[in-house]
């Protein structure tokens, strides 16, 4: 996937290297954001989580790129593709496109990594890149994903020992 990729910015690449994430401010224009929210409004109500990890008060809508062209356009955004091109091996693949809508009263997930299934010891070279597109305010109070800056450089032992279910959600290391 390298359709119309532009150059990644030096700042974004430096942030990804040092802290493990970067933010693309103003990623969705108003028209695209309105389209995404209208689609979600129409679809929500039939996709409750199936287990404790997914959450029983959370809805997940899978395969967004198969549902509407707007999601294909988001996935192929040149700013994201530029980062993928700079950081991943050629011919990388999209493995998931989903919406996660966390409902009131949801139990927080235990801290985890999204690349646990790669059988390569940590710390390791970048083998995947996750993209989160927030379509509303995104914070700990409404269940927004929290990240630990620099945790992408941790060893397997550090990842395994950091967080256990029931630990304080107010941990200052969580950003």
Indicate where each model-derived feature is located.
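Double-stranded beta-helix
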Residues: 4-5, 138-175
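Short C-terminal domain-edge/linker segments immediately following a structured domain
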Residues: 54-57, 125-131, 160-168
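Structured loops at beta-to-helix junctions and adjacent beta-edge loops in soluble globular domains
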Residues: 27, 102, 134-136, 150-151
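Non-heme Fe(II)-dependent double-stranded beta-helix
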Residues: 1-19, 24-123
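Short, conserved beta-strand element in jelly-roll/cupin
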Residues: 121-140
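Short, structured patches in soluble enzyme cores that scaffold and shape functional sites
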Residues: 113-115, 133-137, 147-149
